């Protein structure tokens, strides 16, 4: 399966898919932490649309990690209504929602994650790391298109 992990420079998710035998790539405006040849230092909009000739064919799955700084409710102190960075929040909401729609036009299955935030559409589900074998707690929303909700592996 051809997989794109957008807005990722760590390579962690990309490498997990590659370890399972998928043709996975990551992209971000930043270079990858692991200097992988499977990371594209490009704008995710272009990579989603495959506007370059490096890869043939489209994506089967796109997973996105859009920046959450302005979107998370934890930032209300700086990004809330009437605050100096409120317009940045509004721009981030518009960008993230447009990116989700853009990805859905270019792949049959799409997911993106973000912590509890201010996006205008509710996530398909909320998950916690402890539901999947990690001791941390961080409520995270998943917006899924043509994908089933995750089923917890630990509780």
Predicted feature locations:
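Conserved active-site and SAM-binding loop architecture
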Residues: 1-155
């Amino acid at each position: 399966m051809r997989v794109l992990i957008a807005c990722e420079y760590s390579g962690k998710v990309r490498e997990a898919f590659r370890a399972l035998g998928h043709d996975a790539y990551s992209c971000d405006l930043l270079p990858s932490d692991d200097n992988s040849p499977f990371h594209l230092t490009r704008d995710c909009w272009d990579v989603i649309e495959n506007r370059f000739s490096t890869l043939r064919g489209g994506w089967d799955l796109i997973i996105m990690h859009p920046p959450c700084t302005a979107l998370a409710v934890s930032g209300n102190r700086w990004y809330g209504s009437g605050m100096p960075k409120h317009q940045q929040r509004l721009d981030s909401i518009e960008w993230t929602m447009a990116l989700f729609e853009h990805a859905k036009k270019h792949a049959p299955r799409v997911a993106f994650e973000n912590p509890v935030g201010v996006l205008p559409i509710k996530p398909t589900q909320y998950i916690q790391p402890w539901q999947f074998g990690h001791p941390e707690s961080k409520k995270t929303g998943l917006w899924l298109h043509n994908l089933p909700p995750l089923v917890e592996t630990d509780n």
